[in-house]
């Protein structure tokens, strides 16, 4: 009896163990199949991943190359602009130098020859000639204090003398001084009114033909040449100067 019970227990235990073993083997097989499936999928994905990585690498490389190209372009443009600006500045400076270039003679006035400079002696001679004359053509002034006038500009008939003398000096008509005839006549009439001061001048007038009053015969007075009147005035001046020189001696 005990043997029969023992056999039943062994039989049940064997069945249970066999079931468990079979079930474990099935689980292991299923697990192995899943693992193999995952491995296959992973192996299949490797080319895809490599392709993606390759494309991404090329894209990154292309971006880097494009950045380098852009930087190179900008650098070239900036360098070209700088060179262009420098060239333009040099050309502008060169043009300015040409415009502002000073002739050698002006830059070095000392290099001029002595013949280009007016000699001091000639200047002194001109100054002395003007000092010895009553009229200075450069300034257009008359020196009424000049000794060559013999003091006639300051006598009783000084104003008449100044008018006649200035009229003749500044005359631009032909013959010279033709419009000054009346002024010279007025001067001579003044001389006659003051014989004590103008004896010599009146003596020269007496040697010549007596003058006709301008108011009485204008035609005769106008016929008298201006040169003759100028000569008379010159004689008066010279005689007056000689008289003063003799008195001072």
UniProtKB/Swiss-Prot annotation:
Disulfide bonds join 146-148, 157-190, 167-180. It comes from the Eukaryota. The keyword Protein transport applies. InterPro entries: CHCH, CHCHD4. A motif (Cx9C motif 2) lies at residues 180-190. Keywords: Disulfide bond, Membrane, Mitochondrion, Mitochondrion inner membrane, Oxidoreductase, Protein transport, Redox-active center, Signal-anchor, Transit peptide, Translocation, Transmembrane, Transmembrane helix, Transport. The chain crosses the membrane at residues 37-55. Residues 95-127, 232-249 have a biased composition (Basic and acidic residues). It is a single-pass type II membrane protein. It is found in: Mitochondrion inner membrane. Coiled coil: none annotated. Residues 154-198 form the CHCH domain. Required for the import and folding of small cysteine-containing proteins (small Tim) in the mitochondrial intermembrane space (IMS). Forms a redox cycle with ERV1 that involves a disulfide relay system. Precursor proteins to be imported into the IMS are translocated in their reduced form into the mitochondria. The oxidized form of MIA40 forms a transient intermolecular disulfide bridge with the reduced precursor protein, resulting in oxidation of the precursor protein that now contains an intramolecular disulfide bond and is able to undergo folding in the IMS. This is Mitochondrial intermembrane space import and assembly protein 40. It comes from Debaryomyces hansenii (strain ATCC 36239 / CBS 767 / BCRC 21394 / JCM 1990 / NBRC 0083 / IGC 2968).
């Amino acid at each position: 009896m005990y043997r029969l019970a023992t056999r039943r227990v062994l039989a049940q235990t064997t069945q249970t163990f066999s079931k468990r073993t079979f079930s474990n083997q099935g689980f292991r097989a299923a697990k192995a199949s899943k693992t193999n499936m995952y491995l296959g999928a992973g192996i299949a994905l490797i080319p895809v991943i490599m392709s993606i990585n390759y494309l991404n690498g090329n894209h990154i490389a292309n971006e880097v190359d494009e950045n380098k190209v852009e930087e190179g372009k900008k650098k070239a443009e900036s360098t070209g602009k700088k060179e262009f600006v420098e060239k333009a500045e040099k050309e502008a400076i060169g043009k300015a130098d040409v415009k502002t270039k000073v002739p050698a003679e002006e830059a070095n006035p000392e290099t001029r020859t002595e013949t280009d400079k007016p000699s001091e002696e000639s200047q002194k001679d001109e100054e002395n000639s003007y000092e010895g004359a009553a009229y200075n053509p450069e300034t257009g002034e008359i020196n009424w204090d000049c000794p060559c006038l013999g003091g006639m500009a300051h006598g009783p008939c000084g104003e008449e003398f100044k008018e006649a003398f200035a009229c003749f000096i500044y005359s631009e008509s032909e013959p010279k001084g033709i419009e000054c005839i009346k002024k010279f006549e007025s001067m001579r009439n003044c001389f006659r009114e003051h014989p004590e001061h103008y004896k010599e001048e009146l003596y020269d007038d007496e040697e010549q033909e007596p003058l006709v009053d301008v108011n009485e015969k204008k035609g005769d007075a106008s016929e008298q040449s201006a040169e003759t009147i100028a000569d008379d005035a010159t004689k008066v001046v010279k005689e007056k100067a000689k008289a003063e020189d003799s008195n001072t001696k």
